[in-house]
């Protein structure tokens, strides 16, 4: 089963967990310091909450499509490249308390999208040094929006 991912940067993680638990009628699947995610069955959605530092309002962090296996990530990467989109591929990257394979693209408005599979748990929210995940936005670089913030 594939599902769309919506990652939000929120000013108050605990309040957001409470709100989204009520909204979707289910608690989070994973809670870690500064991070929570919900695996919502209906509608099929992976909702990711990332605590923002000193932010007053919730904002979009990035979008994604969670797939079942690494082969689907590879297929998406090939399809996206063949369609002319610039891609950034990552394999076995630790991000958002998970080990993932993924491919990033950027929409015309600068919105980062990832197609990814979760392969297991990780001990850290932050990215590896060579990963596009969890990188602060830098409007000065051409590929900055690809994987601009985090998962």
Curated annotation (Swiss-Prot):
**Residues annotated as domain VOC:** 2-118
State the Gene Ontology BP annotations: response to cadmium ion
Gene name, please? arsI
Q: What is known of its domains?
A: The thiolates of the vicinal cysteine pair (Cys95-Cys96) directly coordinate the arsenic atom of the organoarsenical substrate.
Q: What is the effect of changing residue 100 to A?
A: Retains less than 5% of wild-type catalytic activity
Residues binding Fe(2+): 5, 62, 114
* Species, as recorded: Thermomonospora curvata (strain ATCC 19995 / DSM 43183 / JCM 3096 / KCTC 9072 / NBRC 15933 / NCIMB 10081 / Henssen B9)
What is catalyzed by this enzyme? methylarsonous acid + AH2 + O2 = arsenite + methanol + A + H(+); roxarsone (III) + AH2 + O2 = 4-hydroxy-3-nitrocyclohexa-2,5-dien-1-one + arsenite + A + H(+); nitarsone (III) + AH2 + O2 = 4-nitrocyclohexa-2,5-dien-1-one + arsenite + A + H(+); 4-aminophenylarsonous acid + AH2 + O2 = 4-aminocyclohexa-2,5-dien-1-one + arsenite + A
Q: Name one GO molecular function term.
A: dioxygenase activity
Fetch the InterPro entries from UniProt.
Cadmium-induced_rsp (IPR052393), Glyas_Bleomycin-R_OHBP_Dase (IPR029068), Glyas_Fos-R_dOase_dom (IPR004360), VOC (IPR037523), YqcK/CadI-like (IPR049789)
Q: What is its EC number?
A: 1.13.11.-
One Pfam family named in its UniProt record: Glyoxalase
Temperature-related activity notes?
Answer: Exhibits robust catalytic activity from 37 to 55 degrees Celsius.
Q: Which UniProt keywords apply?
A: Dioxygenase, Iron, Metal-binding, Oxidoreductase
Briefly, what is this protein's role? Nonheme iron-dependent dioxygenase that can break carbon-arsenic bonds, playing a role in the detoxification of environmental organoarsenical compounds. Catalyzes the oxygen-dependent demethylation of highly toxic methylarsonous acid (MAs(III)) to arsenite, which can then be exported out of the cell. Can also cleave the C-As bond in several trivalent aromatic arsenicals, including roxarsone (III), nitarsone (III) and (4-aminophenyl)arsonous acid.
Q: Name the PANTHER family on file.
A: CADMIUM-INDUCED PROTEIN CADI
Q: This chain belongs to which protein, by name?
A: Trivalent organoarsenical cleaving enzyme
Q: Which cofactor does it need?
A: Fe(2+)
Quaternary form?
Monomer.
So where does roxarsone (III) get bound?
61, 95-96
| Miscellaneous remark of the record | Organoarsenicals are used as herbicides, pesticides, antimicrobial growth promoters, and chemical warfare agents. Arsenic is the most widespread environmental toxin and is classified as a Group 1 human carcinogen.
């Amino acid at each position: 089963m594939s599902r769309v991912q919506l990652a939000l940067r929120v000013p108050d993680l605990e309040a957001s967990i409470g709100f989204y638990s009520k909204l979707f009628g289910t608690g989070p699947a994973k809670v870690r310091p500064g991070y929570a995610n919900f695996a919502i069955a209906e509608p099929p959605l992976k909702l990711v909450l990332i605590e923002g530092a000193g932010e007053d309002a919730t904002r979009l962090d990035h979008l994604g499509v969670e797939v079942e296996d690494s082969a689907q990530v590879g297929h998406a990467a090939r399809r996206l490249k063949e369609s002319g989109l610039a891609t950034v591929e990552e394999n076995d990257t630790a991000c958002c308390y998970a080990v993932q394979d993924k491919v990033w693209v950027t929409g015309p408005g600068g919105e980062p999208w990832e197609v990814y599979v979760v392969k297991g748990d990780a001990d850290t929210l932050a990215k590896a040094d060579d990963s596009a995940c969890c990188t602060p936005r830098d409007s000065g670089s051409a590929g900055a929006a690809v994987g601009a913030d985090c998962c």
